[in-house]
């Protein structure tokens, strides 16, 4: 994959396929600590395999597929950019949680891509799913912003333009 927004799309699609009725997306951009964080929590069916299996590129639970490259590629990208990936049960919603960290200034950090459009398109094509977006960091003008999808996407789009 070429940018973080495509990984976010994959995570959101996984949540929807797992039957999530509520998905929390947390994005944190902190220049002081040189860190980007992305968390996706859902109330879907949770992990149907051990986290080690889910991160194996040759394991998938998707019918008709032979590999499950998305999470393993995301983990490799995160580690290459001085961060990591953790996956497990969601402590707040009871489904699954994926948490990704990367150093913002790392030369190997993939571009963030169009995170705002990814969030909006996913939300409008899955109207039966409730999305909560949390934006944190100096890019967003406040310590923490929780907003409806359209408002959060607009704020996110403006901040991504400044990062470009």
Regions found by a protein language model. Give the residues of each.
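N-terminal assembly/transducer modules of large multi-domain enzymes
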Residues: 104-164
């Amino acid at each position: 994959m070429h940018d973080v927004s495509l990984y976010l799309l994959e995570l959101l699609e996984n949540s929807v396929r797992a039957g999530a009725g509520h998905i929390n997306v947390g994005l944190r951009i902190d220049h002081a600590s040189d860190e980007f964080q992305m968390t996706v929590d859902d109330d879907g069916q949770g992990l149907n395999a051990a986290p080690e299996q889910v991160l194996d590129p040759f394991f998938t639970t998707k019918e008709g597929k032979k590999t499950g490259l998305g999470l393993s590629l995301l983990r490799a990208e995160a580690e290459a950019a001085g961060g990591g990936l953790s996956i497990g049960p969601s402590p707040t919603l009871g489904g699954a949680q994926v948490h990704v960290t990367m150093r913002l200034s790392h030369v190997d950090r993939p571009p963030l891509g169009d995170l705002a459009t990814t969030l909006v398109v996913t939300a409008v094509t899955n109207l039966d799913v409730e999305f909560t977006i949390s934006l944190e960091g100096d890019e967003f003008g406040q310590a923490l912003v929780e907003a409806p999808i359209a408002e959060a996407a607009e704020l996110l789009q403006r901040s991504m333009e400044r990062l470009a």
